[in-house]
């Protein structure tokens, strides 16, 4: 088999700058003659604010909606719902990890959406990362925060880690 991907998590120092996760990948399986017998794409980006600023959330989601809509207007609602349902701490009374984003997996190329389509889609979503996230960082990076803000950030960051361990 063969796999490639890009994955990142940014855990900021400033309590008012959200954590962000981004992951895009492709997998291939081969038979004994080295022929591709299966291939699929997956990925997504999601935002986990410690303190919610609705304008930042709207901006983040709109940026990914715009990226998705260029390929298929059904992608954003579908992939947003998958993300919303995936990043949940079920052992904590269904606590959400953050405000969601998009997430997709097992997208196999076919006659209408081939390999190049899915590569271009993943690239467009990756390219949306900077315009979706950096404006929020720029707006929030100079905000002063208290020890109480930092304590809350550490609790929420612990829940983020918990999600990945459970």
What is the predicted role of each segment?
Residues 1-166:
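A domain-level signal for the structural core that forms small-molecule/cofactor-binding pockets
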């Amino acid at each position: 088999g063969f796999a490639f991907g890009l994955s990142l998590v940014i855990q900021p120092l400033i309590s008012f700058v959200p954590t962000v996760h981004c992951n895009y990948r492709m997998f291939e399986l081969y038979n004994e003659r080295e022929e591709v017998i299966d291939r699929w794409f997956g990925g997504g980006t999601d935002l986990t604010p410690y303190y919610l600023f609705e304008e930042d959330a709207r901006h983040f989601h709109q940026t990914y909606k715009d990226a998705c809509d260029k390929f298929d207007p059904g992608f954003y609602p579908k992939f947003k719902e998958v993300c919303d349902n995936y990043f949940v701490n079920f052992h904590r009374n269904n606590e959400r990890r953050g405000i969601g984003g998009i997430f997709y997996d097992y997208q196999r190329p076919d006659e209408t959406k081939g390999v190049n389509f899915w590569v271009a889609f993943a690239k467009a979503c990756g390219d949306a990362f900077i315009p979706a996230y950096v404006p929020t960082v720029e707006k929030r990076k100079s905000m002063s925060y208290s020890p109480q803000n930092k304590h809350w950030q550490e609790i929420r960051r612990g829940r983020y880690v918990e999600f990945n361990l459970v």
